Amino acid sequence: GLARFGLEYETVAAGNPGVVYASISGFGSGPKGAVLPGYDLIVQAMSGLMSLTGERDGEPYRAGISVFDVMAGLHATIGVLSALNARHTNGRGQHVEVNLLSSALSGLVNQSSAYVAGGVVPFRMGNSHPSLFPYEPLPCADGELIITAGNSGQFRKLVEVLGVPELADDPRFVRNEDRTANREELRPLLVDRLRTRPKMEWFRDIIAAGVPCGPINTVDGGVAFAEEVGLEPVVHVGEGTSAVPSVRNPIRFSETPPDYRLPPPSLDEHGEDIRRWLAAPADPQATDEERSA
């Protein structure tokens, strides 16, 4: 680790007690966890996430992105900002530690809490929700539409749009717990109606009725929809022909918006500068500005 270079927290803090020092590991800094390599996929497996992802009778699946790498980075950022805020009060820095496994268990939210608080070990349910229905993708004439009627009011609006308003007063489906218990009876009744029209037609009508829903997009469809609703998801960094399209920072600031100035460097763009800097003899009296020059 960094101790080989004299850069572990204790050494750095001895020279600068106000330093805020962040560390991210796979399984913590304890003697048992520190020796384990931390890769996102391994943590998806060992945290239990993969046991929750996939069809009930199928194999466990990983998430489509390195979700816990991202989450741990966000947790570290929150920790650093909290430590900086504390330093304004007490003048002291501190060591902020984050590990992938703890971030993962936190990110499992209701699933990990169900086990910790009640001993309930959750299981895979495909795209179904354990305690809500309809709350999953349902097939239309040309593809699937996610419908999340999370309460009885929304369910009533949904079946009215679908042309089967009598289902809202059917004793099997009146309450959410009834709909969940009888989902295998309710699903084909909804699907029979949904299959009569394309998903985007249903999307427009169901949304207009106040029921949350959405089509399952590919990534290009996700970007296109963000553009359609005015989120401006793509920003061009740089100028002219060297400008590089990138995904926009998701955080909007009313007073201090991000400044997208420098595009990613081209291959070896700064190579000569770096090689010259590495070859130069170190001057302990040089300022940071002189060293960077």
How would you describe each model-predicted region?
Residues 76-83, 111, 157-161, 189, ...:
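Alpha-helical scaffold segments in soluble metabolic enzymes
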Residues 3-145, 149-150:
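Active-site-adjacent "lid/gating" segments in soluble enzymes
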Residues 115-122, 225-239:
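Short, surface-exposed loop/helix-turn segments at secondary-structure junctions
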Residues 84-88, 162, 278-279:
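Short, hydrophobic alpha-helical segments
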Residues 133-209, 213:
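Aromatic-enriched alpha-helical interface/lid elements that frame and gate functional surfaces
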Residues 207-229:
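Conserved PLP cofactor-binding pocket of PLP-dependent enzymes
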